[in-house]
Amino acid sequence: MSFSPLIRQLIDALRILPGVGQKTAQRMALQLLERDRSGGLRLAQALTRAMEGVGYCRQCRTLTEDELCPQCADPRRDDSLLCVVQSPVDVFAVEQTGFRGRYFVLKGHLSPLDGLGPEAIGIPELLGRVADGAFSEVILATNPTVEGEATAHYIAQMLIPKGLTISRIAHGVPLGGELDLVDGGTLAHALAGRKPISL
């Protein structure tokens, strides 16, 4: 089916979203145009406002509408702990655990093949953030992928000489998981990171 230029432009715009392919974008576009024009206009207005009004926190680099995000503006948080994550969505995930420390958001992970070196993801800014000596522990909460592990290892190499405690989030068997359903790599990490039981 051949679409008009405006419909084609809408479909192409929707395809930039993660997980949205050609067919899904077509269905979304046609749904908005045929059945929910007011919803489409609300979506367009909300998207415009967000793109114009949401920026980055000047301390942790997560998404926020203010100069400081709510976590950085909160004086009750533990200033001795810094959790390093790969993206703003990771801040929201860690917040669900009840973590009360501070954050630093990288812009992804090291990937030399994609041209993403330490400067591109913000490692110099991270080193600047810990330079004042306020933090006693840095928790590396990058993703458990090859790139995430490489990023955590690189950061640890940069921070260990500063005398900080450097920790890595644990990886392993999910709570309630069954061993026969866990992949070999995850199970190997779980075995390597085992802890003694104290009674």
Swiss-Prot record:
Key word rRNA-binding present: no
Entry similarity comment: Belongs to the RecR family.
InterPro entries named among the record's database cross-references: DNA_Rcmb_RecR (IPR000093), Rcmb_RecR (IPR023627), Rcmb_RecR_Znf (IPR015967), TOPRIM_dom (IPR006171), TOPRIM_RecR (IPR034137)
GO molecular function, one term: zinc ion binding
Domain called Toprim: residue spans: 80-174
Keyword terms: DNA damage, DNA recombination, DNA repair, Metal-binding, Zinc, Zinc-finger
Protein name: Recombination protein RecR
SUPFAM superfamilies, alphabetized: Recombination protein RecR
GO biological process: DNA recombination; DNA repair
Stretches annotated zinc finger (C4-type): 57-72
Keyword set includes Zinc-finger: yes
Coiled coil spans: none
Xref: CDD domains: TOPRIM_recR
Recorded superkingdom: Bacteria
Organism: Stutzerimonas stutzeri (strain A1501)
